[in-house]
């Protein structure tokens, strides 16, 4: 662990206590409200966590942080919680054969002597502690392009230079453009894609994103492409607009997952978007089969256990998808833009999000929010139908089969397939059983549930 040697205020030592992973400082004088004071903490040691000191896949020594969710405290004195956002600087002295990457803009890079180099990075945009970034290794660095006057960079191991430069050049700029147009301005001074041994997938560290070293293979495959899209989405959601508590982590991970899907819809077509929704729905149902009690919002903290899982990511994304369908695509977009603008570089709660979105629709959102975020149940529907030739009607009965006794209010889309035609109808369900009668001149060939993939539910169709 780390040993604190001294704490200074105005170059004079002050008394302190370092115990139970917390640093308590005796203030040397009284400070008024909103006063700014600077303390210097001098400490040393080998971090127990949070800063990975080890080899790259090529056997070279390296130093990379792994802060998520609350491990920054193991190597930096910080308020290690999402609600505390601060600007940051890293001034690093390292052996001269290393390159150093961090948040923000490069202020200085100077040779100190034959063996050492000083590198100074400074970020002027406030961020939460898990988003601080430090990577020290041998790198090949490419200045790929610019976006709105801000550099796009690639940092990869020199052994992977050609592969990494190829992998990261696309779709980075296109993704930045899409999110800027859909949501609002990119908050940071640069965007660097960085190969790292400290993550398996990606980590959205602000302005300088880590990607698992083994994702770099020179094939620009779908796996890496989707991680790039997801981590760049975090620069808007999670980074610029940051959850106030761990319990609101879906505002980061659910949003990044869904906005990955929105970019896929934009860039690769509706079929890819729908496929991603279906895969997400399968993961949600599988998770629910293993744990039927997990609520997206449930007073959890990083100190007590994991704050994210498939419900945070995939169900969070589905909540946004259903909200977009409920509000209408353009109205949803207007609400998202207003939400981002209001909480740009600030902290936010689920209450804040729904209060902002409610301004853009007359339909009350309280029931929607409550059933999808504050309840663990997954909608389980049995759709039974028969054709009554005497009345020329299709009789449809929709039963909610949840065993807990909690029932959703939701629109269920049904496609009625006839021999020469088909049509989609929307049926509003509530309570255990809902029944409907639909005019039809002849018996349908089939009825299909949720043909447009708009509802998070498990479906069973029965013909009576």
Locations of regions flagged by a protein language model:
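Hydrophobic helix-coil surface modules that form long, contiguous segments used
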Residues: 66-70, 78-229, 258-261
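Short alpha-helical catalytic segment bearing the HExxH-like zincin motif
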Residues: 223-236, 250
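Beta-strand-rich binding/interaction modules
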Residues: 4-8, 101, 365-366, 379-381, ...
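Amphipathic alpha-helical substructures
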Residues: 267, 309-396
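Acidic/His/Gly-enriched intrinsically disordered linker/tail segments
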Residues: 253-318, 322, 326, 343
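Catalytic Zn2+-binding segment of zinc metalloproteases
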Residues: 232-247, 262
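A surface-exposed beta-strand-loop module
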Residues: 2-59, 115, 432-443
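Glycine/proline-rich low-complexity spacer/linker segments in large multi-domain proteins
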Residues: 33, 42-89, 139-144, 453-464
């Amino acid at each position: 662990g780390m040993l604190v040697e001294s704490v200074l205020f105005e170059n004079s030592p002050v008394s302190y206590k370092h115990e139970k992973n917390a640093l308590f400082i005796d203030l040397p004088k009284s400070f008024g409200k909103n006063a700014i004071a600077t303390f210097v903490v001098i400490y040393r040691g080998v971090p127990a966590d949070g800063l990975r000191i080890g080899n790259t896949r090529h056997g070279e020594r390296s130093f990379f942080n792994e802060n998520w969710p609350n491990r920054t405290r193991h190597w930096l004195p910080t308020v290690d919680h999402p609600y505390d956002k601060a600007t940051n600087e890293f001034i690093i002295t390292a052996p001269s054969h290393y390159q150093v990457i961090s948040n923000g803009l490069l202020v200085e890079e100077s040779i100190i002597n034959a063996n050492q180099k000083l590198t100074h990075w400074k970020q002027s945009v406030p961020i939460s502690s898990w988003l601080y970034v430090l990577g020290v290794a041998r790198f090949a660095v490419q200045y790929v392009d610019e976006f709105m006057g801000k550099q796009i960079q690639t940092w990869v191991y020199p052994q992977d230079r050609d592969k990494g430069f190829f992998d990261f050049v696309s779709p980075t700029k296109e993704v930045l453009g899409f999110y800027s147009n859909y949501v609002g301005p990119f908050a940071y001074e640069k965007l660097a894609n960085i190969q790292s041994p400290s993550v398996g997938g990606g980590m959205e560290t602000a302005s300088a994103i880590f990607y698992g070293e083994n994702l770099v293979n020179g094939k620009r495959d779908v796996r890496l492409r989707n991680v790039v899209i997801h981590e760049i989405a975090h620069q808007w959601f999670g980074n610029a607009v940051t959850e106030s508590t761990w319990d609101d982590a879906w505002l980061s991970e659910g949003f990044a997952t869904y906005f990955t899907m929105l970019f896929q819809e934009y860039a690769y077509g509706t079929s890819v978007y729908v496929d991603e929704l279906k895969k997400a729905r399968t993961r949600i149902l599988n998770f629910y089969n293993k744990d039927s009690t997990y609520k997206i919002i449930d007073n959890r903290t990083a100190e007590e256990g994991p704050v994210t899982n498939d419900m945070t990511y995939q169900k969070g994304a589905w909540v946004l998808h259903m909200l977009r369908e409920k509000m209408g695509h353009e109205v949803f977009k207007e609400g998202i833009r207003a939400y981002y603008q209001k909480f740009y570089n600030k902290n936010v709660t689920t209450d804040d999000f729904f209060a902002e979105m409610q301004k853009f629709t007359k339909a009350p959102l309280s029931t929607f929010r409550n059933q999808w975020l504050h309840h663990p149940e997954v909608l389980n529907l049995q759709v039974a139908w028969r054709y009554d030739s005497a009345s020329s009607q299709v009789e449809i009965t929709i039963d909610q089969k949840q065993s807990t006794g909690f029932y959703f209010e939701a629109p269920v889309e049904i496609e009625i397939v006839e021999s020469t035609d088909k049509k989609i109808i929307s049926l509003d369900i509530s309570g255990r059983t809902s029944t409907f009668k639909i005019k039809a001149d002849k018996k349908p060939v089939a009825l299909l549930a949720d043909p447009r993939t708009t509802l998070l539910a498990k479906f069973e169709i029965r013909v009576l």
